[in-house]
């Protein structure tokens, strides 16, 4: 089976731990735990790399340390080194347009205002790569977006996270085992975690 690269987007540093914008980091951390592989910092790739075996073959996990807006530098370096075309890439990242508990697999698409994805498109020269968008919701009334995404998950949201991250792992493993289209039909309609009581 072909080698696959799974990239989680986020910002490095303790101050960004458990923030909504780091949902991608949290998701690939969950994958690393599931596949029992360890993170190693690789300066040549400007990120943390973990290599393991998922369903269907060998997989590489990546957490860029370039900060969100320059994630494409790290992804391009890894893709070039391992000679991976965009079709063997899946990017996991936060999505304010989806409520907490929802995830969406897509085969391709625009950046839709996400600076991390914008950087990937610029450095890879294409938007033809799969992605898993992880819903982080949006406070009503809409706040300043930057403050919201860089804020930490609220305590009641933290309670939902384990189930949401389990859903991300299941969806990625379904992509590997059954293909993207089948995984989309299963997971794009599901919700994970119980919303807090009103």
UniProtKB/Swiss-Prot annotation:
Its EC number is 3.1.1.29. One of its GO terms (molecular function) is peptidyl-tRNA hydrolase activity. It comes from Gloeobacter violaceus (strain ATCC 29082 / PCC 7421). It catalyses: an N-acyl-L-alpha-aminoacyl-tRNA + H2O = an N-acyl-L-amino acid + a tRNA + H(+). The record marks 11 as: Discriminates between blocked and unblocked aminoacyl-tRNA. Hydrolyzes ribosome-free peptidyl-tRNAs (with 1 or more amino acids incorporated), which drop off the ribosome during protein synthesis, or as a result of ribosome stalling. One of its GO terms (biological process) is protein quality control for misfolded or incompletely synthesized proteins. Its main location: cytoplasm. Monomer. The active site is at 21 (proton acceptor). It comes from the Bacteria. Belongs to the PTH family. The record marks 94 as: Stabilizes the basic form of H active site to accept a proton. The keyword RNA-binding applies. The gene is pth. It is found in: Cytoplasm. GO terms for cellular component: cytoplasm. TRNA binds at residues 16, 67, 69, 115. The lineage of its organism: Bacteria, Bacillati, Cyanobacteriota, Cyanophyceae, Gloeobacterales. It is an enzyme of class 3 (hydrolase). Keywords: Cytoplasm, Hydrolase, RNA-binding, tRNA-binding. Pfam families: Pept_tRNA_hydro. This is Peptidyl-tRNA hydrolase.
